[in-house]
Amino acid sequence: MTSLMFKEACSSSEVVAAQLKAEGARYAELGAALRAKPPQTVLTIARGSSDHAAAYVAYLIMARLGRIVASLPMSLVTLLNAPLHADNALAIAISQSGQSPDVIEPIRYFRKGGATTVAMVNDATSPLAQSAQWCMPLHAGAELSVAATKSYIASLAAGAQLAGHWENDANFLAALADLPEALAAATELDWSEAIDVLTPANNIMVVGRGISYPVALEAALKLKETSVIQAEAFSGAEIKHGPMALIDNGYPLMIFATRGPSQAGLIHLAEEMRGRGARVLLAAPADVAERNLTIPVAGTPDLDPIVAIQAFYMMAAKLSLARGLNPDKPRHLSKVTKTN
């Protein structure tokens, strides 16, 4: 059996290529507008996988543009009616469906208050798309599996487009143009070792740091959704502040060690946790001898997390089936979630 989750994840390369072609000029226009009037405040508005994509976007904006970004607790608007000042703010909403009130209402609130509002959304006819000043379609197409894959990767690519065009960095944008090729390569990798380790597992820690932490969050969510594994994501800087007390002999630990300043520390953490008895699955590029799982590299380290999660999705879809589950229809879940 080949799941819809697997098939949809495999199409991410084509999805990103379509988005780059269709929306590049629009992102260039948005980037020019942000350079002409730089926002004092940047907020992200999202739930679930989209919030993990928002964390990646926040990292890019802070690291590359020096703008402080915060994730909005949506209940401040939807439940508490807090008097938030929106003038000269940039509010970025990310959503697959564009249907959830707790994402729509803050965008409407901030737009009314004078903020620049951007909706990265798969359904360009949705209420969220209609509520934002800038609707930036993800071009992921219909996603039938409950587990979001191609729409998440499309959200990461959209965030990279926003940051790249805002910074107006030709080298970064050139690397982004080559991203579909790297995504295609990620679908061909052998992560069977992870399936062998996780098929009998009940729990796991998923670790990243810096630019790779958002995909650790996403991987942990997918392991919960599709394989019913109690998965928790941690920054490599936080795992020693309590969580490693859980480590005992054979405890699974997946570490995303993509290129960049955090990589050396994550490789060292993998070795330390092996010494404590953990069953470590170190996902890293081919030049890291200590790796268990290989991830391809993109044109720049800041895009590596996108190809890393693509490789993970291929494995996760197979793992769910190996555990006797249906990754397309996780129990208790539905494709569109509406919360206030």
Regions from the PLM with identified roles:
Residues T2-S3, K7-P39, W134-P252, R323-N340:
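Active-site phosphate/pyrophosphate-binding segments
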Residues K7-C10, S126, I309:
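Alpha-helix N-cap/helix-start motif at coil-to-helix transitions, marked by capping-box chemistry
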Residues R35-E181, R209, F256-D302, M315:
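Glycine-rich phosphate-binding loops that contact phosphosugars or nucleotide phosphates
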Residues Y251-R259, A308-I309:
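Hydrophobic membrane-spanning alpha-helices of multi-pass integral membrane proteins
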Residues G299-N340:
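Generic C-terminus detector
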